[in-house]
Design a protein with these regions (language model features):
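Short A/G/S/P-biased low-complexity tracts
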Residues: 214-220
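Acidic (Asp/Glu-rich) sequence patches and key acidic residues
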Residues: 1-213, 224-225
């Protein structure tokens, strides 16, 4: 079963946390020519809630190194914080389910800003022969990969066996497709959650009230597992 996130932005004014309704968050699905409601507006009042297990792990240690059905997806991240629960002074909203699920947490903009986003992480997954040769062996990120792979014509090889196959030193069956699981070249946490880092955090910075600080803006979120 997959995991999704529900998230709101809040601003503290005069000591009270309020739900932010300002449209400051860029819409990743925006399409000027679209007639779909979710794609028509360039900016939204809620942070993007797209599924990104790397981000979930960074925010709260959720799905840390695990993908769909628990398959390994990479090294474990060092989360900003483990799940804190919902804040007692959370604003009223119709986005979050609350304690009914119990997977809530929150982070201030200061916590997000002071986190080390330049830490390195390596993703892990199954790649086919062409991808391994063209990307992995050159120290580059693959253009596609899977948490696992199976099928009638699929053969899983170890990495040394894949190298031998590419070098024509492993017996090949032309009716089969060959895959291997491996770690990829390191990338930064920032790159693992680039939309959140580049766009969502920029939107949060725009919410800092006059005379306020990064402590006066936060996200409250929950995971729907």
């Amino acid at each position: 079963m997959g995991t999704d996130i529900n998230v709101i932005a809040e601003v503290r004014r005069n000591g009270v946390w309020e739900l932010s309704t300002a449209k400051v968050f860029k819409n990743p699905w925006y399409d000027q020519a679209s007639n779909k409601k979710w794609a028509m507006e360039e900016y939204m009042s809620q942070p993007d809630d797209s599924r990104n297990y790397n981000l979930f792990a960074i925010l709260a240690g959720v799905r840390n190194g695990e993908g769909f059905a628990g398959c390994r997806t990479g090294e474990r991240f060092k989360p900003i914080s483990e799940l804190k629960g919902y804040p007692d002074n959370m604003s009223k909203n119709d986005v979050l389910f609350g304690d009914e699920y119990g997977y809530g947490s929150w982070l201030t903009l200061r916590e997000l800003h002071e986190y080390d986003w330049e830490q390195l992480h390596r993703n892990y997954g199954y790649v086919d022969e062409d991808t391994y040769r063209d990307y992995i062996m050159n120290g580059e990120q693959p253009n596609s990969y899977s948490g696992d792979i199976w099928g009638h014509n699929i053969i899983k090889l170890t990495e040394p066996e894949m190298v031998d196959l590419i070098n024509d030193e492993y017996p090949r069956d032309e009716s089969k497709e060959y895959y291997t699981a491996c770690y990829f070249a390191p990338i930064t946490y920032r790159e693992c959650a680039s939309w959140f880092y580049d766009e969502t955090m920029e939107g949060l910075r725009r919410l800092i009230p006059d005379g306020g600080t990064e402590d006066d803006v936060r996200i409250v979120f929950e995971f729907d597992c």
